[in-house]
């Protein structure tokens, strides 16, 4: 392992947080079942989205372990490529697609959008052609859809977490200071909290 004990005490808990934070949607779905039944297409399949989001974090942790938790420009956890890194991105995409489908899957456009993104992402990743574009598209679509359904401006804070993720990831690559590794992971995984808040605020005021 290439990081010291002090840095480990920061980075490891953040990755555990990233692995578990999707579970925050579970009580939101269960406790607000009647409300969601009136607002979304099929709330029960959100559980499957949670599973895929957690799987994505698991693959990321696995890749980080292989990289000895030290992210650089050349490492697969950085700007490099690997099977595990690809599975991480793909699992996040599928999880996001499932959530979007759960919200407005009654629209044929959404079915085709999700299908196309799921099919083309592995190719784009392998060919190194805008590999994060599918994630960007589905992320924006989910945020806007959640706002239209729940009417809570707090959901737009997801865009802030994305911006901070990009900023801290670039700092990590430029400096190789692994403190930014923790910050990148923290903000990359925290957007789902604002979806939870949007559901809770809309359902309970």
Residue ranges of predicted features:
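N-terminal topogenic module of multi-pass integral membrane proteins
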Residues: 1-76
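Hydrophobic cores of alpha-helical transmembrane segments in multi-pass inner/ER membrane proteins
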Residues: 15-27, 89-102, 140-145, 186-202
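Lipid-exposed faces of alpha-helical membrane segments in multi-pass integral membrane proteins
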Residues: 17, 21-24, 48-62, 91, ...
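Juxtamembrane "helix-exit" motif on the non-cytosolic side of transmembrane helices
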Residues: 30-34, 62-70, 104, 123-129, ...
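Membrane-interfacial loop-to-transmembrane alpha-helix junctions, especially the N-terminal start
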Residues: 37-52, 107-114, 152-160
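Aromatic-anchored segments of alpha-helical transmembrane domains
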Residues: 55-58, 116-126, 161-172
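Membrane-proximal helix-loop-helix units in multi-pass membrane proteins
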Residues: 83-150
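Terminal transmembrane helical module of multi-pass membrane proteins
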Residues: 149-205
């Amino acid at each position: 392992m290439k990081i010291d004990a002090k840095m480990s005490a920061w980075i490891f808990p953040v990755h555990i947080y990233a692995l578990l934070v999707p579970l925050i949607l579970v009580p939101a779905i269960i406790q607000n079942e009647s409300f969601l039944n009136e607002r979304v297409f099929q709330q029960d399949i959100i559980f499957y989205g949670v599973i895929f989001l957690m799987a994505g974090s698991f693959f990321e942790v696995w890749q980080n372990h292989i990289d000895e938790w030290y992210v650089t420009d050349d490492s697969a956890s950085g700007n490099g490529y690997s099977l595990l890194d690809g599975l991480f991105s793909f699992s996040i995409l599928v999880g996001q697609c499932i959530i979007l489908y759960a919200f407005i899957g009654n629209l044929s456009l959404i079915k085709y959008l999700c299908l196309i993104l799921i099919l083309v992402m592995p190719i784009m990743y392998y060919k190194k052609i805008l590999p994060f574009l599918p994630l960007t598209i589905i992320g924006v679509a989910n945020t806007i859809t959640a706002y239209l359904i729940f009417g809570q401006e707090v959901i737009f804070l997801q865009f802030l977490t994305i911006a901070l993720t990009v900023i801290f990831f670039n700092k990590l690559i430029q400096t190789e200071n692994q403190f930014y590794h923790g910050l990148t992971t923290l903000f990359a995984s925290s957007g789902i909290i604002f979806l939870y808040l949007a559901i809770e605020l809309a359902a309970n005021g």
